[in-house]
Amino acid sequence: MTRKSILVTGASSGLGYAAVQKLAENGFYVFAAVREIRGMFSNIKNIKELKLDLANEQSIEELFIYIEATQKDYPLWGLVNNAGICVPSPLELLREFDLRQQLDTNVIGQLLVTQFALPFIRKSKGRIINITSGLGSIAVPYLGAYSIAQFAKMAFTDVLRRELKHSGVTVSVVQPGAIYTPIWDKFLVTGQEILDNSLDEKRKIYERSFIEFLKASQIGVNSVKTTRNDFAKVILDIFKAEIPETHYYVGDDAKNFSNKSKILTVTEIDEWFDLQSPTESEFKKI
């Protein structure tokens, strides 16, 4: 007996882990793609943990060689492009490595995964879900590289959906709001490291407002009521829907963020973030 399979990237923790568990509990066979195999799903029969480095095309190809060998029993019907990393930094202090890593993981690698997956999903007339964030609606100071990646992923989703309109494959985007996941654990430490490795004159400009932003972000994410399970339920709903919608939000904050991007003028959005940015006197320190 065959069983529909779904590939979930970024499955080792956080939102991806929750989605894998939810899908498996509801009868799907799940390929859980992780950077390092740790046997976290070894006791669950319908989850297969597979190694995947999104910055390495050979790693992506090897994953799909394995998936291709399973198609008789577990035809690939779904893809959840969930993997993502976020390195906070003022754009002036942003390291090239951090920018490239975020683009490789959040955009380029996921496009490559989609390219490899499409022949299988087109055959099964399946579904693709791209996970972005509220930062795909409004670009946020000190999360510039991540915002760039999320805007790119929104465009990637729109183009893919339009190109596949008559293929039988559906494409949806999910924008979660603030949800605590391990991605936040290194937020303040990473930000401080970037400041410590910056030239003194540049650090003086951004240090106060950047540290305040990092601390406020951690406090904010620890106070939200939206959970990983809420996210996982949305993913399951998309795969169970007769006809999935093109756009989903997880959490009121995500929907509100998107609405503000449509209602507020650019000037109003700039003013909204004004208190988060360096002051005129801080720029005069150099």
Swiss-Prot record:
Which keywords are on file for this protein?
Answer: Oxidoreductase
In the record, what terms sit under GO molecular function? oxidoreductase activity
InterPro entries, per database record = NAD(P)-bd_dom_sf, SDR_fam
Q: Does the keyword Zinc-finger apply?
A: no
Catalyzed reactions per annotation = 3-amino-5,6,7,7a-tetrahydro-1H-pyrrolizin-1-one + AH2 = 3-amino-tetrahydro-1H-pyrrolizin-1-ol + A
The active site of this protein is located at 146
Q: Does the keyword Transcription apply?
A: no
Q: What is its EC number?
A: 1.1.-.-
An example GO BP is:
steroid metabolic process
Q: What class of enzyme is it?
A: oxidoreductase
The record's similarity note reads: Belongs to the short-chain dehydrogenases/reductases (SDR) family.
Q: What does this protein do?
A: Involved in the biosynthetic pathway of pyrrolizwilline, a pyrrolizidine alkaloid. Catalyzes the reduction of 3-amino-tetrahydro-pyrrolizinone to 3-amino-tetrahydro-pyrrolizinol.
| PANTHER family on file | 3BETA-HYDROXYSTEROID DEHYDROGENASE DHS-16 (PTHR43313:SF1), SHORT-CHAIN DEHYDROGENASE/REDUCTASE FAMILY 9C (PTHR43313)
Q: What is this protein called?
A: 3-amino-tetrahydro-pyrrolizinone reductase
